[in-house]
């Protein structure tokens, strides 16, 4: 999840400047597991294992191997301070993290250096990347609900996905349950997130997302909801996609 940037290079057709400014203000707190980004830290292991397992099934790897993603090129679009980039680098992937917020990228580079990890972080947008670049795995995690044009954004993501590659998208469904839990509950009652982090009308239903992916010649192969248990303070995968959900889609082999 990430999105005014400190770099004029970060302008693009689908990036919302207000969204960039919002997440830039949070950038210094990205790596604090007890701070304002705590919900992301709690859900991160689940996202990581879901993506890893999907990639290992697709590319016929052993998910238990410490370098199971070795040789695979991955991009995390809207990478924030690198909460997914770092663990996937440790699993052997060649990772590029892009984010339009210069402060997020600075935080990501600093943490990667401290962790002695080599990650290619770029303050840019997917629209501004070299159109010849291609990736085995394209991640757009909690990003599409912050862009101005979901269709245009996903079209660009699809364009950089290799033939036979994977795209993984995580976002929020749009219904009254998601309004009650993701906005009223998370931002006003529990105060997990700063008020205004999300706009309910920007949430995307699974049907809408599937249609966008299909329009870009991507076939949905897996999907799962993420459900929070307040008593256990734990997230788990579920068939319930009413609020948070993830979708895996594949491009046709070349």
UniProtKB/Swiss-Prot annotation:
Function summary: O-methyltransferase that catalyzes the 2 O-methylation steps in the ubiquinone biosynthetic pathway.
Name listed for the protein in its UniProt record: Ubiquinone biosynthesis O-methyltransferase
Enzyme class, first EC level, given as a word: transferase
Pfam families assigned to the protein according to its UniProt record, in alphabetical order: Methyltransf_23
Family matches, as PANTHER family: METHYLTRANSFERASE, UBIQUINONE BIOSYNTHESIS O-METHYLTRANSFERASE, MITOCHONDRIAL
Binding site for S-adenosyl-L-methionine: 47, 78, 99, 141
Molecular function, one GO term: polyprenyldihydroxybenzoate methyltransferase activity
Listed NCBIfam families: UbiG
Reactions mediated catalytically: a 3-demethylubiquinol + S-adenosyl-L-methionine = a ubiquinol + S-adenosyl-L-homocysteine + H(+); a 3-(all-trans-polyprenyl)benzene-1,2-diol + S-adenosyl-L-methionine = a 2-methoxy-6-(all-trans-polyprenyl)phenol + S-adenosyl-L-homocysteine + H(+)
Enzyme Commission (EC) number: 2.1.1.222, 2.1.1.64
Ubl conjugation as UniProt keyword: no
Family according to the record: Belongs to the methyltransferase superfamily. UbiG/COQ3 family.
InterPro entries attached to this UniProt entry: SAM-dependent_MTases_sf, UbiG_MeTrfase
GO biological process, alphabetically ordered: methylation
Keywords: Methyltransferase, S-adenosyl-L-methionine, Transferase, Ubiquinone biosynthesis
Organism name: Rhodopseudomonas palustris (strain BisB18)
Pathway annotation from the record: Cofactor biosynthesis; ubiquinone biosynthesis
């Amino acid at each position: 999840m990430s999105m005014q940037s400190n770099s004029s290079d970060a302008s693009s057709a689908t990036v919302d400047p207000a969204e960039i400014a919002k997440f830039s203000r949070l950038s210094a707190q990205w790596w604090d597991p007890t701070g304002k980004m705590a919900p992301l830290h709690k859900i991160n292991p689940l996202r990581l294992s879901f993506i890893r397992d999907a990639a290992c099934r697709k590319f016929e790897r052993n998910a238990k191997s410490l370098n199971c993603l070795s040789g695979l090129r991955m991009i995390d679009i809207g990478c924030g301070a690198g909460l997914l980039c770092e663990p996937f680098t440790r699993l052997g992937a060649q990772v590029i993290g892009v984010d339009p917020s210069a402060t997020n990228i600075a935080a990501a580079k600093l943490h990667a250096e401290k962790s002695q990890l080599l990650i290619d972080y770029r303050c840019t947008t997917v629209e501004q990347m070299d159109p010849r670049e291609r990736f085995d795995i394209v991640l757009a995690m909690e990003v599409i609900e912050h862009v101005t044009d979901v269709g245009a954004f996903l079209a660009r993501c699809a364009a950089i996905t290799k033939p036979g590659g994977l795209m993984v998208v995580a976002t929020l469904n749009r219904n009254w349950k998601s309004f009650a839990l993701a906005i009223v509950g998370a931002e006003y009652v529990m105060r997990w997130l700063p008020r205004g982090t999300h706009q309910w009308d920007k949430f995307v239903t699974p049907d809408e997302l599937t249609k966008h992916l299909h329009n870009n010649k991507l076939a949905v192969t897996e999907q799962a909801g993420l459900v929070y248990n307040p008593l256990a303070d734990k997230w788990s995968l579920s068939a319930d996609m009413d609020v948070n959900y993830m979708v895996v889609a594949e491009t046709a082999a070349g």
